[in-house]
Amino acid sequence: MPELPEVETVRRGLEHLIVGKKIVSVEVRVPKMVKTGVEDFQLDILGQTFESIGRRGKYLLLNLNRQTIISHLRMEGKYLLFEDEVPDNKHFHLFFGLDGGSTLVYQDVRKFGTFELLPKSQVEAYFVQKKIGPEPNAKDFKLKPFEEGLAKSHKVIKTLLLDQHLVAGLGNIYVDEVLWAAKVDPERLASQLKKSEIKRIHDETIRILQLAIEKGGSTIRSYKNSLGEDGSMQDCLQVYGKTDQPCARCATPIEKIKVGGRGTHFCPSCQKQ
């Protein structure tokens, strides 16, 4: 699944490719993907121009003249831009014909991606309603509210970091990486963490996600950015996908377990409770 760094990389690619382009045709082949109604979606966006491309957590914000398309890539979603003819592909589901003759295509092997069309004035309330936490950067992600949120929780730390309420954008890959870097067992109860451990998790979340953005995300399975290029963060991963390989800190073999139903990579030595 694309996590925050991958979605940010897609955002930057789309910003370069489609901002200023006018939508001259719309085709939706899988209506269920458009959660706010496919007929209104197709009618309302026709003739509007992509003014800017934003992001909130793992959500893309395709800002038009009057409205915003909120796009969630889910497991396998990606965008492709074709300058001329669009090839046949059963996994191409949404088509935005643009002035100048190019076509922006949404591809999704599993059809889990979603689109919602909202007035711009309702976008902020949308994310408040979903309880999406702050962006994982030094400006927005403050230590004190993070400490307070952990203290109130009855969840283990990995599950809590995945739920997006205390900090936005973390998924399975980067939670494993953050907890390894912070030397915290993924099965520790969040409310029992020491202040020093919480600060390490906080600081490593910011550091690792910013590094991943710089590297263009991790290419794991099917992820590519909106230019069709692989990211390179996978070359910097220390624990995710490294079952039975030696820990980079202590050489203990990395183990993979299930935490809250999610495959979880950790070092049983330097992340022990």
UniProtKB/Swiss-Prot annotation:
Keywords: DNA damage, DNA repair, DNA-binding, Glycosidase, Hydrolase, Lyase, Metal-binding, Multifunctional enzyme, Zinc, Zinc-finger. Binds 1 zinc ion per subunit. Gene3D superfamilies: 1.10.8.50, MutM-like, N-terminal. A zinc finger (FPG-type) spans 238-272. It comes from the Bacteria. Its cofactor is Zn(2+). One of its GO terms (molecular function) is damaged DNA binding. Its EC number is 3.2.2.23, 4.2.99.18. InterPro entries: DNA_glyclase/AP_lyase_DNA-bd, DNA_glyclase_Znf_dom_DNA_BS, Formamido-pyr_DNA_Glyclase, FPG_cat, MutM-like_N-ter, Ribosomal_uS13-like_H2TH, Znf_DNA_glyclase/AP_lyase, Znf_FPG/IleRS. It catalyses: Hydrolysis of DNA containing ring-opened 7-methylguanine residues, releasing 2,6-diamino-4-hydroxy-5-(N-methyl)formamidopyrimidine; 2'-deoxyribonucleotide-(2'-deoxyribose 5'-phosphate)-2'-deoxyribonucleotide-DNA = a 3'-end 2'-deoxyribonucleotide-(2,3-dehydro-2,3-deoxyribose 5'-phosphate)-DNA + a 5'-end 5'-phospho-2'-deoxyribonucleoside-DNA + H(+). The keyword Cell membrane does not apply. SMART domains: Fapy_DNA_glyco, H2TH. GO terms for biological process: base-excision repair. Belongs to the FPG family. NCBIfam families: fpg (TIGR00577), PRK01103.1 (NF002211). Involved in base excision repair of DNA damaged by oxidation or by mutagenic agents. Acts as a DNA glycosylase that recognizes and removes damaged bases. Has a preference for oxidized purines, such as 7,8-dihydro-8-oxoguanine (8-oxoG). Has AP (apurinic/apyrimidinic) lyase activity and introduces nicks in the DNA strand. Cleaves the DNA backbone by beta-delta elimination to generate a single-strand break at the site of the removed base with both 3'- and 5'-phosphates. PANTHER family: FORMAMIDOPYRIMIDINE-DNA GLYCOSYLASE (PTHR22993:SF9). Monomer. This is Formamidopyrimidine-DNA glycosylase. It comes from Streptococcus mutans serotype c (strain ATCC 700610 / UA159).
